[in-house]
Amino acid sequence: MAGRRAMRPSGSSMRGVVARLAAARSPAVSFLVAAAAGAALVGGVYFWLVVSSFRLPDSRAVGCLPDGEGSWAIGMYYGKSPLELRPIELEGRSNGNSSAWPVANPVLTCATPTEGGYPSNFVADPFLYVQGDTLFLFFETKTVSTMQGDIGVARSLDQGATWEFLGIALDEAWHLSYPFVFKYENEIYMMPEGNKKKELRLYRATKFPLEWTLEKVLIDKPLIDSSLVQYDGLWWLFASDFTRHGIEKNAELEIWYSNSPLGPWSEHKQNPIYRSDKSLGARNGGRLFIFEGSLYRPGQDCSGTYGRKVKLYKIEKLTKEEYKEVPVNLGIEEAKKGRNAWNGMRYHHIDAQQLASGGWVAVMDGDRVPSGDSTRRSLFGYMGFLVAVALVTFVGFVKGAISCYIPPSFWVPLTRRSELSRILPVHRFNLKIRRYSTSIGRNISATKARLSEKTWSNTLFFCVIALIGIVNVCIAVHFLLGGNGAEEAYTHQGQHSQFTMVTMTYEARLWNLKLFVEHYSRCESVREIVVVWNKGNHPTSDAFDSTVPVRIRVEEINSLNNRFRGDPLIKTRAVLELDDDIMMTCSDVEKGFKVWREHPERMVGFYPRMIDGDPLQYRNERYARGKKGYNLILTGAAFMDSEFAFSKYWSQEAKEGRDYVHKNFNCEDLLMNFLYANASSSRTVEYVHPAWAIDTSKLSSVAISRDTQKHYDIRTKCLAKFASIYGPLPQKWLFGMREDGWDK
């Protein structure tokens, strides 16, 4: 009993511990609550300013989920030569059903099989099969339910502008990819990669394109990304085997040859052709092709990340004993928009084939994130969170808000039964720990005392700690809540498109224009930026940091009517008229473009106004909010159909209005609204609420709206003038009518 009683802490000791905890609880809780509130405020502001502009994963989505392998998609390319291919958006292919003028890459995404009933995280490794005027596209699709690759197939009847998902062509118990499809002796075969099975299999179509049967095992080795080509009287097989001894992954290439694609196959004398250096493009990057008598091989440059880009090689010598290839230019311009481009980070596979017309068509996959990006972002996010927590704990401890008390009895042996316990290793270890903890405690106390002094150095120290904490909170929010960090374009009816930005400016605003161009040129759907130069010495196009072409259109007369002048060089139907003193996120711009594509007969913009009263009076957005609706959209930030809007503005019926605009140097946007309303009995305007927008016009000495009251008075007179000529504006449209909430 005595031994048992000794095991319990004494009453006085327990009371002391409880008293210390009670005394520390209140300031500790208050400090932690305050720190959490501060972190939440910082994180909330950062989320609103930065993260809210990213395309965030939909928690209700069944496909297109974040995946460590990437977010691969597939694009179409055309050209007179396989060495000079251009993306589909530069070919002027359109689809009015999806308001895609033009259709833009990517043409196939994870949404394609997902909407077809087969949820997928990405699509990659595309191979074409040309059958007359019909294109069949076979590709790897990362199935959500099994988290492995299956072979999907889609069909196009318009040479790749639109695609219909047909289903899953091949599904095995192991991962499948790289579906090399070819025809031999009137049979259609598929040779997919399935290296987990440790053999290279050949399948034959029994009912093309969805039903296949195993024909035979070609090679009993786990070959990767195998491609066939018939050349100089033999069939050649190019592949990689990463199980070879001393081989660097993604850096090995070997060749096999045979008289028939059905085998038997013999190894090339020089195998392995490559065995190290992932940047050389050893791993195949698609189908080999013959052009003007020469054989070309696409390979993957895997330096930095898997599948970083496609390299093209011209094969100068290929025999059973010798092999030589030299790099040549791929002929495809690399994306410049980083994560905001569907292939901005990597592209690792291309399949180019010649059509009966003589032209060439190609499919290529691409990704906006590097390999392992989702895992890396989670790691960085949690590290930022833990560092922020550690800093809060440190500051609380130093300031005395948080205390850590360890009772001395913790280190005392729990029994007195035997004095021999004093010589046991456990007891010696306890004494050593106690000495160390006492020493650490003294040092901590001394540090707390020094940091408690009110000196400028201590103030600076805690400011630095606070700054580091703020940075880590932002890091945590950015990487944990920011999706893949891209401001992605939205699709309409499964297709992407592009628009042209038009802005009007003067010499005095050149500094502003440069910021404008640099920012908006990175938006994914922007095709070109047209600068309407109204006055002064104009710059050259190369004066701007832009990822898209910038065209300076110099006007002879300084007039606001120039904003809507017809321009035959504009290659897109959609135009975003945007003042050069307005800055908003690319994500908001992309939302506006999607809404316009849903209703291309409307003007879709970001600045609503409610025009009413007798007589009509021009008021700000606050008035529209008070009225809970709007009937006018300012064209200083609005999408419109350039073919309709520009021709309408420069029609004979609009001449009196244009003359009034030119005379008053104001109200061109109001005139456009009256012309739209006069041309249709249906709705003509729609609003999209931006996450945030910065209007720098008040900072400019040349802005016509700098004097607000004078500006409003002029516009009120414009309303009376235009109403007398063109009739009234439409009735009010309520905010918050869209299901997605973009117009609240």
From Swiss-Prot:
One GO molecular-function entry: glycosyltransferase activity
Active site: 669
Name of the molecule in the record: Glucosamine inositolphosphorylceramide transferase 1
Homology family: Belongs to the glycosyltransferase 64 family.
Biological process according to GO: lipid glycosylation; protein glycosylation
Biological source species: Oryza sativa subsp. japonica (Rice)
Domain of life, source organism: Eukaryota
Binding site for Mn(2+): 581
Knockout-associated phenotype: Loss of the GlcN(Ac) glycosylinositol phosphorylceramides (GIPCs) is seedling lethal. Stunted plants when regenerated from callus.
Annotated InterPro entries: Exostosin, GINT1_N, Glyco_hydro_beta-prop_sf, GT64_dom, Nucleotide-diphossugar_trans
Residue numbers binding substrate: 534, 558-563, 579-581, 609, 665-669
Pathway recorded for this protein: Sphingolipid metabolism
Membrane topology according to the record: Multi-pass membrane protein
Coiled-coil stretches: none
